[in-house]
Amino acid sequence: MFVTQDIVLRFFFSKKIIIKNGFSIPKNSSIILAPTHRSRWDGLVLTMAMGRRVSHKDCRFMVTKPEMRGIQGWFLKNLGCFSINQLSPSLSALRYAVDLIEKGEQLVVFPEGKINKYGKKLVLKEGL
C-alpha cells in the first residue's frame, strides 16, 4: 500500500485533489462507500480522498473477477482489492466483505459494476 499511496498517487495527483468540507471519521466505525464509477482513476482518487491518512483505514475494493488479471490485477491486489464473480458470487467473497465490515474496515463497492461514462443511464448490476 505504501508504494501505491505514497509514490504513485502523489505523482499523478499531488496538486489536483482538493477535499472540501472534510469530515472526521471515527476510527472504530465501519465504512461502506458506493461511488459512481466514471474512470479507471476512481479507485486511486478515492484512496487519496478517503484512504488511511483521512479515515485511518485502507480502502478495500470489491472488483469484478476479470479486473484481477495480469499486471492490472497485481496492482489492484496491492491497492486492497478482492474479486467477486458478478454472475455467480461465491460465499467466500461475500464472507470476506462481511468480515471487513465486522472488523471496522472500509469497503468500496462500485454499484454500477463497471465504468460508466457521463451522460449514460446508470444501471445497477447484480452480483453482490
Predicted regions and their residues:
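N-terminal membrane-anchoring alpha-helices
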Residues: M1-S14
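Soluble catalytic domains of membrane acyltransferases
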Residues: S14-L128
